[in-house]
A protein has these predicted regions:
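Acidic, metal/ion-coordinating pockets
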Residues: 2-17, 23-438
Length: 438
C-alpha cells in the first residue's frame, strides 16, 4: 500500500508513537531554562504541550473509537454430523394371484397393494429391494412358477411405492433368457429405478449402482453390489458371461475396493443365497461370506435374500472403521403369494431393515444403529401389504391374532441387536440414481 494513503487508524498509531519523543526533548529544555521562565513569568515548559497533548488524546480516542466500531467476523458454526437412513426390503415375487389383485382393468397397479407401507420406504433416504424375477414384454400377461415374468410396468410401480433401486441377480434372472434380462434392465432404466447384479456388458457388470444422497448440505455416495448363487439349472448366456454376477467373494471384495477408490462413502452388498429355502437361520456359506466381507474392511452392510423368510440381523467384527459390519442374513418376502398353503407361515411376512448412516464433519462414515419393521401380506384383503406390530395391524382382514403371531415370529428371528421401528422415518433429502457405465 502507498504510504501516502494509509487509513486514518494507521496514521493515528504513527502519531502516537512519535509524540513521546517530542515530550522528552521538551522536558530537557524546560529543565535548562526553568529559572529564566520563572523570572519572566512565562511557563515555557507547558506551552508546547498545550498545543500537542490534547491532539494526542483526541487521536487516541478516535483510534479507540475506530477500533471499537470495526465489525468483528462471526465465528462459523461448527459442522454437525448428518444422519442418513437406508432401508432394505425383501423379495418382489409377482405370483399370478398377486398380479391379479394388482390388475385395475388397464394395468397392474402394484403400488396400490404396497401403499400401506409406502411411508416406511419414502421416508428413508435410500430404499433397496430385491427384484426376484425378470419382466415380460409390454402388454404381456405375467407368468408364475417355475418360469417367472413380471408385468412390464412393475419397476415403475416399485418407484411409485417408494423404492429407489433393487438387486436383480437371483436364481430366476434368466427365466426369460438373455433377452428378458436385458428387457428387465431397460424397464428399470425407463422407470428411473436403480439396478445391479445383472448387466448388458462387461463394463456394466463391473460397475456398482451408485446413489448420491444430498441432505443438510452434505452428499453421501452409496455403492450397491449384488450377487446370486445359481440359475436354477438354466443355461448361462454363453456369449454374455458377464450378464449375471454369480457368488464370488474375491470379486465382491475387488469391486468394493474399486467403488471406494472411485469415491463411494458406503458399500452395500446384496447376497442371494443359498440352497435351502424357508429356514430362519443362515447357512454356513452365508456366514462365511459375511465374515470374509467384514474382515475385508471394505463393506458396510450385507443384505441377504432367497430364503423367503426373515433371518437374523447381526453386527460382525471388522468393517471399514473397525466398528463392525451389519448383516441381515434374510429379509424375507416383500410381496408374494407365499403362505402356509405352499411353504411356511413365515413366508407371509418380511422385514424392512433400517440402517442409520452417520457422516461426520471430518468425512468419516459410520453405521452405528440398525432397526427393523415387520410387514406381512393381507391376502384376505387382496394381497395388500401391512405393517404389523405387537398389537397386530389396524384395518387388516387377516385375523389380528394371526398378525400378532407373525410379528412375534419376525421379532424372535431378527434378534435383539437391532431395535424395532414402529413409526415411519422422515427425510428432507434428495436421492439421485447415477446411471451405470455401459
Amino acid at each position: 500500500m502507498d504510504k501516502g494513503h494509509l487509513p486514518p487508524s494507521r496514521t493515528a498509531l504513527r502519531a502516537a508513537k512519535q509524540q513521546p519523543r517530542r515530550s522528552v526533548w521538551k522536558v530537557a529544555l524546560a529543565t535548562t531554562i526553568g529559572a529564566a521562565a520563572v523570572i519572566f513569568g512565562v511557563v515555557f515548559y507547558a506551552s508546547p504541550f498545550e498545543s500537542s497533548f490534547p491532539v494526542l488524546v483526541v487521536e487516541e480516542a478516535a483510534e479507540s473509537q475506530s477500533l471499537q466500531s470495526e465489525p468483528v467476523a462471526a465465528e462459523p458454526e461448527p459442522k454437525q454430523p448428518v444422519t442418513f437412513t437406508l432401508v432394505a426390503g425383501g423379495d418382489v415375487l409377482t405370483h399370478i394371484p398377486v398380479a391379479n389383485s394388482a390388475w385395475n382393468g388397464e394395468s397392474y397397479e402394484f403400488s396400490r397393494l404396497m401403499q400401506p407401507v409406502s411411508a416406511y420406504l419414502e421416508g428413508a433416504d435410500l430404499a433397496l429391494c430385491n427384484m426376484e424375477v425378470p419382466v415380460g414384454e409390454p402388454g404381456a400377461a405375467p407368468t408364475g412358477f417355475p418360469i417367472f415374468s413380471a408385468p412390464y410396468e412393475t419397476p415403475a410401480e416399485l418407484v411409485k411405492a417408494g423404492w429407489d433401486g433393487c438387486s436383480t441377480s437371483s436364481n430366476h434372472s434368466v427365466d426369460q433368457g438373455y433377452a428378458g434380462l436385458v428387457r428387465t434392465l431397460e424397464s428399470f432404466d425407463a422407470a428411473g429405478l436403480g439396478h445391479v447384479g445383472t448387466a448388458r456388458s462387461q463394463e456394466e457388470s463391473d460397475s456398482p449402482q451408485l446413489y448420491q444422497i444430498e441432505r443438510d448440505g452434505e452428499t453421501l455416495t452409496v455403492a450397491h453390489l449384488a450377487f446370486a448363487h445359481n440359475l436354477n439349472g438354466l443355461d448361462f448366456p454363453s456369449d454374455a458371461p458377464w450378464a449375471i454376477n454369480l457368488n464370488d467373494t474375491a470379486r465382491i471384495i475387488t469391486l468394493a475396493q474399486q467403488a471406494r477408490e472411485d469415491g463411494a462413502d458406503l458399500v452395500v452388498v446384496s447376497y442371494h443365497c443359498c440352497e435351502a429355502e424357508y429356514i430362519s437361520y443362515p447357512e454356513q456359506q452365508q456366514i462365511d461370506v459375511a465374515n470374509d466381507l467384514a474382515a475385508s474392511g471394505l463393506v458396510d452392510i450385507m443384505i441377504g435374500h432367497h430364503a423367503h423368510v426373515p433371518q437374523p440381523v447381526e453386527l460382525l467384527e471388522g468393517g471399514p472403521t473397525g466398528e463392525g459390519m451389519w448383516v441381515a442374513y434374510g429379509t424375507g418376502n416383500f410381496i408374494s403369494n407365499q403362505s402356509t398353503e405352499c411353504c411356511v407361515e413365515q413366508s407371509s411376512s418380511g422385514a424392512l431393515i433400517y440402517f442409520d448412516v452417520v457422516l461426520d464433519p471430518d468425512g468419516e462414515v459410520t453405521v452405528p444403529e440398525a432397526s427393523w419393521t415387520a410387514i406381512t401380506l393381507d391376502r384376505e384383503y387382496g394381497h395388500v401389504m401391512r405393517v404389523i406390530t405387537a398389537q397386530g395391524s389396524e384395518g387388516a382382514s387377516t385375523p389380528q391374532e394371526t398378525l400378532v403371531r407373525r410379528h412375534s415370529q419376525v421379532a424372535e428371528v431378527i434378534g435383539t441387536v437391532a431395535s424395532e421401528r414402529t413409526e415411519a422415518p422422515t427425510t428432507d433429502g434428495t436421492t439421485r440414481v447415477v446411471p451405470r457405465n455401459r
